[in-house]
Regions:
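His/Asp/Glu-rich metal-coordinating catalytic cores
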Residues: 2-70, 75-286, 305-319, 338-342
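A glycine- and charged-residue-rich anion-binding loop/surface
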Residues: 16, 40-44, 65-66, 356-359, ...
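Short glycine-rich phosphate-binding loop at a beta-alpha junction
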Residues: 92, 386, 548-549
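Conserved hydrophobic residues forming the short capping helix/wall of the S-adenosyl-L-methionine
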Residues: 107, 402, 537
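Short Gly/Ser/Thr- and Asp/Glu-enriched loop/turn motifs at secondary-structure junctions
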Residues: 121, 416, 543-547
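Hard-cation-handling environments
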Residues: 199-329, 333-358, 362-518, 526-527
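C-terminal tails and terminal domains of large nucleic-acid-associated
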Residues: 518-554
Length: 554
């Protein structure tokens, strides 16, 4: 290989400048590996969209060069896009046991085989083309999270994945500090590190702190306790179970994703539940309210989640009763604040006692704060640094932290999705771009909804639609019947008869003018109807409904 080829290209396809859809490609010569393949949930204006996944055009164009996919942990923003990726790129997928356990459920739902998934554990070594990878245990808000040591012909890259330094983890499995330090002694060319909490000073509290809060709440609660949390936070679920056992309560689990993760975690040994503690939700009526704990989804106020349906008095099996204690063991993801607030309000209206503030100790982050981030840098001591996993301000703040530790600014690169970051032994910089963006998933459709469709949906949601049906004579364009106007989401027709009659007149005038000018092309006729009617409606209502002309010829 020539000297000009002694470079590694690092290509983030998602996860930079945003929270979610984490995916990064590493390329050396004709070999590509992929780290993570996550999704993100739609923004508020993405009407009707279920999921957002990264654009993998670059990977499809280089499909024959992709050697393997490596997963850092089992959160949706790191594995959620894999069912869509694996349908098109069939390569080995490596992850820890719990990560693959959760993934296999997703693959089954999407009709994708899990035969090419391979379990790894910290300390294992895997070769994939020119890359040799090692794996280190880290703490996060899900068990079995790992960081990656990626050996390349250019040098050693450390990718932290999502991490925090929890000195008292629930499962007793602390971060492998010694491994990071050993790599630091060996010499690390590039560190790629989690930036989510780069703005937060100090240290992220231990997960065990939440367990102490559960103990306090369980001790004094006189009726049922309902705890909403992320289904993937197995350590938190373990602490809920531990408190339930301590205070002689039975545990019921509600919510599809919660039930799935609990079953997988028990099967793989990550969740330890004494026999007889777990009961079906239908059995809760056989016990006193003071003997019951319900673990549920819905900590983000998701409209169809179990807790939201309970709060709306719309759940088939659980009715919120006065005196119930509801603990929301999570903080709202940005954009979900209103949904969570509405759920809390509705729970209070039903007479529940709701515990939800972070200051009450019912939630801690799964990401490193500034002092832990500094410790990671000091353990690894990289030559170059690239902040990852965060919105742009998080990346900038993380870069500033690295500089405060003595990293030269020219040795830091703040990338963006689609940037080709070229790494050599002596330099790092952005050398080009590849396609990167958001692929929208709507039902079974992947990528068939774009900006134009979203624009139409937004217009429909804001001002409604007006359908104009008119029949014209083929040669003269004279009106034979109609125009008839059907309105949905614009005005209630019976209360706006004058407006509708005048609207019909405007359509007639537009078509008469076209006939006078011998215009017979359908596209022109439809455009004339849209323009004339649109101007009139805006003048009268200051609204712009979607206007859909339907012209029939006889």
């Amino acid at each position: 290989m020539s000297k000009t080829q002694h470079k590694v290209n690092i290509i983030p396809l998602g996860g930079l400048g945003e929270i979610g859809k984490n995916m990064t490609a590493f390329r050396y010569g004709d070999d590509i590996i992929l780290v993570d393949a996550g999704l993100m949930f739609p923004e508020e204006d993405m009407l009707g969209i279920d999921l957002v996944i990264p654009d993998i055009t670059y990977l499809l164009e280089n499909k024959d060069k992709v050697r393997a996919i490596f997963l850092t942990h089992g959160h949706e923003d790191h594995i959620g896009a894999l069912p869509y990726v694996m349908k098109q790129i069939n390569v080995p997928v490596y992850g820890t046991a719990l990560t693959l356990g959760i993934l296999q459920g997703r693959l089954k739902e999407n009709g994708v085989s899990a035969d090419n998934c391979h379990v790894i554990k910290p300390g294992d070594k895997i070769s994939a083309g020119a890359f040799k990878l090692g794996f280190m245990r880290v703490n996060h808000s899900i068990p079995d999270a790992i960081a990656l040591a990626i050996r390349t012909p250019v040098g050693l890259i450390i990718h932290t994945g999502d991490f925090k330094f929890d000195q008292t983890p629930v499962d007793g499995q602390v971060t492998e500090f010694n491994r990071f330090a050993e790599y630091g002694d060996e010499g690390v060319l590039l560190l790629m590190a989690d930036s989510t909490n780069a703005e937060r000073p100090g240290y992220t509290p231990s997960e065990k702190m939440v367990g102490q809060t559960f103990d306090d709440e369980f001790r004094y609660a006189k009726n049922r306790i309902i705890v909403a949390t992320f289904s993937s936070n197995v350590h938190r679920i373990q602490q809920i179970v531990d408190s339930a056992v301590r205070y002689k309560r039975k545990v019921a689990v509600i919510g599809r994703s919660m039930v799935n993760v609990v079953n997988i975690s028990i099967e793989l040994g990550y969740l330890k539940v004494p026999e007889g503690v777990l009961i079906d939700v239908d059995e809760t009526s056989n016990y006193q309210p003071s003997q019951i704990v319900i673990i549920t989804t819905g900590s983000q106020g998701e409209p169809m989640s179990a807790l939201t349906r309970m709060a709306n008095n719309d759940h088939k099996k659980v009715e919120i009763l006065p005196g119930d204690t509801v603990i929301i063991s999570a903080t709202p993801i940005p954009g979900n604040e209103k949904l969570v607030s509405r759920t809390i309000d509705n729970l209070y209206k039903l007479g529940a006692d709701v515990i939800y503030e972070k200051s009450n100790g019912v939630h801690v982050s799964g990401h490193a704060s500034q002092e832990e981030i500094k410790m990671m840098h000091n353990l690894v001591r990289p030559k170059f640094f690239m902040p990852v996993h965060g919105e742009y301000r998080h990346l900038v703040k993380h870069a500033q932290l690295a500089q405060s530790l003595g990293m030269p600014r020219e040795n830091i690169v703040i990338g963006e999705n689609g940037a080709v970051i070229e790494l050599t032994r002596n330099s790092i910089g952005i050398s080009g771009r590849v396609p990167a963006g958001k692929i929208l998933v709507d039902g079974l459709g992947v990528g068939d909804v774009g900006n134009i469709v979203l624009r139409d949906r937004r217009q429909l949601s804001q001002d409604g639609i007006m359908i104009v049906v008119v029949t014209i004579e083929k040669n003269t364009c004279n009106i034979v019947s109609g125009p008839d106007i059907v309105s949905r989401g614009f005005v209630y027709v019976r209360e706006a008869e004058d407006l509708m009659e005048t609207a019909k007149e405007k359509v007639e005038q537009a078509l008469d003018k076209c006939a006078e000018n011998n215009v017979t092309e359908w596209s022109v006729l439809k455009g004339a109807i849209r323009d004339s009617l649109g101007r009139f409606l805006y003048e009268k209502t200051r609204r712009r409904p979607m206007i859909l002309p339907i012209i029939m010829e006889v």
